[in-house]
Amino acid sequence: MATLRKVYREEVTPALKERFGYQNVMQVPQLQKIVINMGLGEATKDKKILEAAQEDLAKIAGQKPVVTRARKSVAGFKIREGWPIGCKVTLRRDRMYEFLERFIHVASPRVRDFRGFSPRSFDGRGNYNLGIREQLIFPEIDYDEIDRVRGMDITVSTTARTDAEGKALLEGFGFPFRT
């Protein structure tokens, strides 16, 4: 079992239940899913860019990414409907907890000039969004094997109803927020 799942059951759940005065354990917010998205606008010109990004994302997430396609044609961006423009992975259950643990304890300390993540990136419903500028912070990515530095968006979806509940949940996992 993932260690963060054990931490959630033994430490985070009782702490949140006491802090927010929940009557039942099922009311305590929990993680639903983590979505990792790589938007690749330049993939329309070269298919190898998309393949390399998929390979990187598969190494990071431990799961095969799905290709995202353009919903509408946009002349300004020089894309047509149905063209591949990125890739994403949705993590749930054990893989989600394992990724979050690696992200919190291994990857985020490797970010240059890291002082913590902004607590303002909650969406009003307890979900947290953050962007990463380079995939090199993950130990699975070898610096010599990448063709270019790519960023990604990470969305942490929770069952929390408010931002305060969502922040308390992520802090319970040891998520590094700026003070």
From Swiss-Prot:
GO terms for cellular component: ribonucleoprotein complex; ribosome. PROSITE patterns: RIBOSOMAL_L5. It comes from the Bacteria. Keywords: Ribonucleoprotein, Ribosomal protein, RNA-binding, rRNA-binding, tRNA-binding. One of its GO terms (biological process) is translation. One of its GO terms (molecular function) is rRNA binding. Belongs to the universal ribosomal protein uL5 family. PANTHER family: 60S RIBOSOMAL PROTEIN L11-RELATED (PTHR11994). Part of the 50S ribosomal subunit; part of the 5S rRNA/L5/L18/L25 subcomplex. Contacts the 5S rRNA and the P site tRNA. Forms a bridge to the 30S subunit in the 70S ribosome. This is one of the proteins that bind and probably mediate the attachment of the 5S RNA into the large ribosomal subunit, where it forms part of the central protuberance. In the 70S ribosome it contacts protein S13 of the 30S subunit (bridge B1b), connecting the 2 subunits; this bridge is implicated in subunit movement. Contacts the P site tRNA; the 5S rRNA and some of its associated proteins might help stabilize positioning of ribosome-bound tRNAs. This is Large ribosomal subunit protein uL5. It comes from Halorhodospira halophila (strain DSM 244 / SL1).
